[in-house]
Amino acid sequence: MLECFESSPVAVAVGVSLLVLLLLCGIGCAWHWNRRESTPFTLPKFMQRRSSRQKDVTKTVSSSAYVISPSMKASVESKGHKSTAKRNKMHGNYENVEVCPPCTEGTTEKALYENTQPSNLEEHVYGNQTDPLYYNFQKPSPPPPQDDDIYILPDCD
């Protein structure tokens, strides 16, 4: 395939243009890496992590001469942002959670976690035995034997 382009001017032009393109790409990459070391690359705010955004905010606040007083801070919070204390109160109130002081008696916890009943060695631990305390189930028994043999005769017309 390349034999037809060996001595033609088209092959020389294509080769030179590819070399120039490769040279431009190399210069662009070198410029990008040198520039990247001097100034850090910053992502847009929606792509940054929250922790890095907070670090950026603290850097900008400390470098600026503008100081926020506590009264101004309260007005900023009331504009549209909820404070963390309010958020924690909201998440702490669940409907189905019983709130009471912790139990000091160790006997109730012991009864919950320890099996104090003596073990029955004849009990089948891994078998398919049903316990009558939990199930109202009767094991199927074979049907009673029939005394008479029943024969079904076809109809004769």
Swiss-Prot record:
InterPro entries: Protein_GAPT. Coiled coil: none annotated. One of its GO terms (biological process) is B cell proliferation involved in immune response. It comes from the Eukaryota. Disruption phenotype: Mice are normal in appearance, size and fertility. In aged mice, the number of MZ B-cells is increased, and serum concentrations of IgM, IgG2b, and IgG3 are elevated. It is a single-pass membrane protein. The chain crosses the membrane at residues 10-30. PANTHER family: PROTEIN GAPT. This is Protein GAPT. It comes from Mus musculus.
